[in-house]
Amino acid sequence: FTPGPVELPDRVLSSAAKPLIGHRCREFSEIFAEIERKLSLLLKSEVPVIILPSSGTGALECLAVNFLSKGDKFISVSCGVFGNRFREIAKRTGAEAVCMDVTMGEGCDIDKTVSFVKEHPECKVLLLTHNETSTGVVNPIKEIISLLPKENRPIILVDGVSSVGAIECYPQEWGVDGLAFASQKGILCP
């Protein structure tokens, strides 16, 4: 069992019952721009938010295929089912996983995680899960990143599927390079 999608508020359900509008019309463009603006405010980000017509899994795949290639190495820090899933998605690129497994139900220890990353400078990417949906553990992403060197550090990709909109998540401020999330959990949308 995993939580989600969430129950939608009546106002969202009512809005979804309205007639569709064309994706090439001005009204759609205005709504889309407003959604991008509001997501940027939610994330406190000046970096453009890219909206994908996919699930959270599709967003994670997008991160993996755009930052990893066959022969690359990446660090996967996992404390549950969805951390493992992000790892498997990344491995499909042909990249090699260097794994740090945390006991399921426990969060990432800041010092151990930072030390592990520093021990593997050959790794191009670091995969982290902000909120591990399978256990409800929130990982200290901000604190981990703050202790990594600013230069010569891996690209940091974060699974925020069940955290964004529910708990604080400020990727630009924290130093996250890529964040994947979906609308059906903390954003309370279809």
Predicted features and spans:
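Conserved N-terminal alpha-helix of the aminotransferase class I/II PLP-enzyme fold
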Residues: S15-C62, R85-K91
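Conserved PLP-enzyme active-site core in the AAT-like
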Residues: T2, V6, E34, G58-P190
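Short, charge-rich amphipathic segments
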Residues: L13-C25, K44-I51, F74-S78, E132, ...
